[in-house]
Amino acid sequence: MYGKNGSMKILILDDDAFRHRTFAQRYEGHEVFHTWTYSEFALAFVKGKPWDLVHLDHDLGDLVQKPDTWVDGWGHQRLRTGKDAVAVICAVSDSDLPKKVIVQSVNPTGARAMVDDLTRRGIPTTWEPFQHP
């Protein structure tokens, strides 16, 4: 499903302003939606589906003022990560899956887990670590 005027619908989840600016420039002319937290992503993903391209970071919260958290079974507060966003993506029907996902995290362990889950769900996924110059 392409957006207006044949452009791609792109959803980006990252807590880094530099990355958001870079992706905005890279995808100029396309419909780009920027989310900074898991909660913003989950809402935008469900409301805007289907997406042509989704960009995901793993480590979220260290660069935003109010990071998303949850409490685990032992009562410890944990930060939401891109892996939580993957669960949202994998839960939708086949017709609502994104055409492609790019994991841009520099966290190799987190990125690999995300790529594995998305690939098992049948979503074309690549890992393209994005570091600041």
Regions found by a protein language model. Give the residues of each.
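Catalytic phosphate/metal-binding cores of nucleic-acid and nucleotide-processing enzymes, i.e., regions
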Residues: 1-133
